[in-house]
């Protein structure tokens, strides 16, 4: 196999100094990978996603490496760093280096407690396992619908950071699709039609379909308005912003709203465009909620343990101001 090698340099609003890429392109299949500030970045999917090696996220990263991670988020939307060994303190420290942590809405809404880490899976704080019939197991099946994290908040999530500690032998994958690629597949006419639209996102609307929402939780998350089409400030790439929390289009009736939002969601979640991530212990995955949709897949909670620690980073502000 032959390789063509060249260098690129990027300097943008997030980065005060150039980031040098050494890009290696294989011939003739066009597959390529990049060496960025000592990190080996290998694409996972034609539309998005990369596997990143050569970096220990539990160790302090210098400014150049952090800037390279931020740039890779903009370029790939999904980054998997395998074989990472972070405890809660180091994960939160890494999160703070990337941006402002987001308060876990479930713990705050249900109990009024401010926490920045949450557990994805069926393991309690004391190490016990919740089974399939547990109230919270049923409640969290809402994550099996296509969604973008915290799109129901006035300032939605920028990125989610999830570190796998225990994973089931079967099931429990997380599937991802790119709403950026889906927007690009739309003809020019429909793109122009949806560009100015505003959509109501509503947590109670989506979660009530799987389980009752505690009143204090509902009160903490009133419906919010979000732009239907978002633009990445660093790259200019555009995508539409939909998912299970998207209830209706502002100014449209329910039937027309539902028809449009369902059609856009279907266009983004075609089977051939899905990347299914099979979790391995030690995986640390960062995904960009501005442009990716994701959903969890079922696993047997009576048989398997699943424990992944998650932090989220707040967006820069309301999507209405983008």
Please provide the spans of the model-predicted regions:
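Short intrinsically disordered, low-complexity segments
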Residues: 8-9, 183
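Fe(II)/2-oxoglutarate oxygenase catalytic core
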Residues: 20-78, 82-286, 290-322
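Residue-level detector of alpha-helix boundary/anchor positions
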Residues: 1-2, 11, 138
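Tryptophan (W) side chains
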Residues: 3-6, 32
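Aromatic (phenylalanine/tyrosine) cluster motif
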Residues: 10, 14-17, 21
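Cationic, low-complexity basic patches in intrinsically disordered or flexible, solvent-exposed regions
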Residues: 7-8, 28
């Amino acid at each position: 196999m032959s390789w063509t090698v060249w260098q690129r340099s990027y300097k943008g609003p997030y980065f005060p100094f150039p980031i040098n890429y050494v890009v290696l392109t294989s011939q003739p299949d066009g597959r390529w990978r990049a060496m960025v500030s000592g990190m080996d970045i290998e694409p996972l999917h034609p539309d998005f996603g990369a596997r990143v090696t050569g970096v220990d996220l539990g160790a302090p990263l210098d400014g150049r490496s952090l800037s390279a991670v931020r740039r890779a988020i903009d370029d790939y939307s999904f980054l998997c760093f395998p074989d990472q060994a972070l405890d809660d303190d180091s994960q939160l420290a890494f999160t703070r280096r990337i941006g402002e942590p987001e308060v876990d809405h479930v713990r705050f809404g249900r109990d009024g407690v401010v926490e920045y880490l949450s557990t994805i899976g069926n393991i309690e704080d004391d190490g016990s396992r919740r089974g399939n019939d547990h109230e919270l197991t049923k409640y969290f099946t809402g994550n099996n619908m296509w969604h973008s994290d915290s799109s129901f908040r006035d300032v939605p999530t920028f990125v989610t950071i999830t570190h796998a500690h225990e994973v089931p032998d079967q099931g429990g994958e997380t599937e991802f699709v790119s709403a950026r690629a889906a927007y690009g597949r739309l003809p020019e006419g429909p793109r122009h039609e949806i560009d100015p639209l505003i959509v109501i996102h509503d947590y109670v609307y989506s979660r009530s379909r799987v389980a009752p929402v505690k009143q204090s939780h509902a009160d903490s998350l009133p419906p919010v308005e979000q732009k239907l089409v978002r633009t990445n400030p660093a790259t200019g790439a555009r995508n539409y912003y939909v998912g299970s929390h998207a209830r209706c289009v502002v100014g449209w009736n329910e039937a027309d709203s539902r028809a449009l939002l369902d059609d856009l969601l279907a266009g983004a979640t075609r089977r051939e465009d899905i990347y299914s991530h099979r979790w391995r212990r030690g995986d640390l995955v960062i995904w960009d909620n501005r442009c990716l949709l994701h959903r969890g897949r079922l696993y047997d909670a009576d048989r398997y343990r699943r424990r992944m620690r998650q932090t989220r980073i707040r967006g820069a502000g309301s999507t209405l101001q983008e």
